[in-house]
Amino acid sequence: MTEKLNEIVVRKTKNVEDHVLDVIVLFNQGIDEVILKGIGREISKAVDVYNSLKDRLGDGIQLVNVQTGSEVRDRRRISYILLRLKRVY
C-alpha cells in the first residue's frame, strides 16, 4: 500500500510516542493537515496517538474529521479509522 505524503499509518512496530513525533515533524515541515490511519488492532493506538497529540499541542491541533469503515485484504474484512488532523495557528 502506498502512503500519501501527509498520511501516517499507525503500525504495531512503533510505539505511540514515535507516531506523535512523526506528526509533529510533518507539522513543522509546513504540512497543515495530516491523516492518521489505524487498521485492525491498531485502531486504538491511532486514537491514543491523537489523545497524546492533544495533550502535547493543546489548542494547536484540531480534529477535522473521523471516518470509519472496512476494506477487504486477503479476502477478509479489516476495519479502519481515519483521523484527519489540522494544525491551528
Curated annotation (Swiss-Prot):
Protein keywords: Acetylation, Chromosome, Cytoplasm, DNA condensation, DNA-binding
Matching SUPFAM superfamilies: AlbA-like
Gene Ontology cellular component terms for the protein in this record: chromosome; cytoplasm
GO biological process terms on file: chromosome condensation
InterPro entries to which the protein is assigned, alphabetical: Alba-like_dom_sf, DNA/RNA-bd_Alba, DNA/RNA-bd_Alba-like
One Gene Ontology term of the molecular function aspect: double-stranded DNA binding
Domain of life: Archaea
Localization: Cytoplasm; Chromosome
Modified residues (N6-acetyllysine): 12
A Pfam short name: Alba
Post-translational modification: Acetylated. Acetylation at Lys-12 decreases DNA-binding affinity.
Major location category of this protein: cytoplasm
Cysteines paired by S-S bonds: none
Family stated for the protein in its record: Belongs to the histone-like Alba family.
Function, as annotated: Binds double-stranded DNA tightly but without sequence specificity. Involved in DNA compaction.
Protein name, UniProt field: DNA/RNA-binding protein Alba 2
Organism of origin: Saccharolobus shibatae (strain ATCC 51178 / DSM 5389 / JCM 8931 / NBRC 15437 / B12) (Sulfolobus shibatae)
